[in-house]
């Protein structure tokens, strides 16, 4: 049993997952949690909050991890921030479960607020794929992740280490820019260079639609997207509830899912998993479960949603953040669990 997440909190959702891991009879029980969880609880920076409830949940999280180790599971922390607060920007963003010959990959973290959001994981039953992803998990476990790609019958898997992402993402960005019939994307946080590539397709007359939540926990992204739409011809449709799904459908023939938000942080710094699927039956299933409901529930933007100034400042701020992250070195990759 191999478990990897960026967020793993000591609330009802996280404790339920931890209990299942602790009770498992698997001989190999390993858990990777990003150092994000030692700094952010319930979307609140621990160093910046005086909220007693958040502090209590943090203590419950540390106790949960201690109990996991006491139950015989192994636990390590990815990308520890250490003494450099700027290292926080480089995260291991992967979400993965490997259980014998079955794997799940996608966007789901283990916390109540994440469980409350619309989200998805792709379940794959295949020994070869499970073995390959277990190998990638082990690279992260050893603190030696590498950029890697592999093709199976109808799925291409990409494992990104946060250092060589520009090369790894190049085929996906080219696929967005070169789309011929349509692009549909569900994501709360898409930005350049992915959105810029989609805009290239839109400039050629290809219909490009992005479904993104109106109640976004990062509203600057919504402002950026609305500003881009005015300048590029992208269609932005707002969903009534928060979604954490990361999915793209290109020309109705290629389904892209995984942990990547299709954003500059993913492109620049995050360790990620991305799957590109050509299986027609699975694409039809995702069309019915994801894209058709998004089309039905979403609404066109309204005049009050748009602000030239908000769009300008959002784009400027995100570009500045990209420059900052580009100048950061790669932090230490792995550490044994210990309380903050």
Where are these regions (language model features)?
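HKD-type phospholipase D/PLD-like phosphodiesterase module
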Residues: 7-178, 211-254, 260-267, 271-275
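Helical hairpin unit composed of two closely spaced alpha helices linked by a short loop
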Residues: 200-201, 206
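Long, C-terminal catalytic modules of enzymes
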Residues: 253-255, 260-340
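An exposure/low-complexity boundary signal
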Residues: 150-192, 301-340
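Structural motif
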Residues: 2-6, 104, 184-189, 214, 256
